[in-house]
């Protein structure tokens, strides 16, 4: 007899749907089958039992860089994630000014402990200011359950030069880590922004001009060329454009271990939204910016055929007054870049991808949990409904029709770019390690229930080997 049995559900298994029970013991899935008995029963009532989602790209409680702080901390952010069907997140140990990479991770651990309601890991981040001993810092963090690092190719204070880029790639490769890259050409962005400002063209719609598809494509190509030279495994985060998606596809043909991530805003928000009146248009400012219908169509096809591997939120939460700097006529160059999305990530794809049969069940599971688990070193515990893994589950009502709006969501952010959008399908019960975190529309656990998850190297066969044994550009 199991501690808990979920009965009567349509269960999303690796090989398809099954009408079966799930037995849970000690927080893990102990059995999958029919006729299971348990000391406690959870009747799914015909709901769809899905793996809990994994969001491997979100921002919570980050240091302030001369602007506004995040509206969501690890408590409110993980509560919002849970109500959206997500059971594990991997945000960033983002450095503040004059903060080392290790110091940034320590800060994030300190501010998350006792606050999260779902499980979480952390990505490291390297900038030009995070210390000269980057190799030693990343190696130390590898022993503390970190298995990935992010680099920026733009943003003042964050963008790395080519030398540091290569040093991080070599180190990450030798550790078996994956490198996440924000790919936009910094010099082109700064040059174009200043020209637009000099010409007085600062309406919100010029955000697309200042962050063009060409700028994203060029940086994507260059980052993947660096990965090709070093043998490093690389995720291009928030792919927004058909051009960048094609760069990833070309790199794969050349043998680059290239992973592509996109986000809901690149399918459900378009560049035309920036043509709205300024206060309305400001809700849609994020970087890279929303793109054309051509990119929407291309990215949908990439979701379908495997060109895109990851569906992440890039949740970047600001209160709206902070986002627009208190201005009633916000400009593209003064509006903070970033939108909330940690709770709407799964409902949007469930409604518009899975229920419409645009996506197969397998592709939906790959995009929302399975790939993130395997890519980011969580597959030994999370990402699938399988015996031995954590009982991280979301029971979805596939008939529930509801309207997205910031008052219906659980983030502290006071706006959503999806205000008024109707979706079908809603997670009604969410379990983390077999414990209901959300049920009957209410939070069921206290802050601190969520645990930090130590991750393993995504490519452990390389871990611990010297760089000269693992780097292609030294083979010639």
Where are these regions (language model features)?
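Histidine-rich, glycine-flanked metal-binding segment
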Residues: 1-52, 66
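Divalent metal-coordination and catalytic microenvironments
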Residues: 9, 27, 46, 57, ...
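Metal-associated gating/positioning segment near the N- to mid-region
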Residues: 44-115
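Active-site mouth loops of central-metabolism enzymes
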Residues: 58-72, 93-95, 121-134, 209-213
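Alpha-helix-loop-beta-strand connector modules within alpha/beta enzyme cores
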Residues: 102-118, 167-181
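Histidine/acidic residue-rich metal-binding segments in metalloenzymes
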Residues: 135-311
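His/Asp/Glu-enriched, well-ordered alpha-helical/loop segment
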Residues: 202-233, 309-310, 317-399
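C-terminal cap of metal-dependent C-N hydrolases
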Residues: 324-331, 387-454
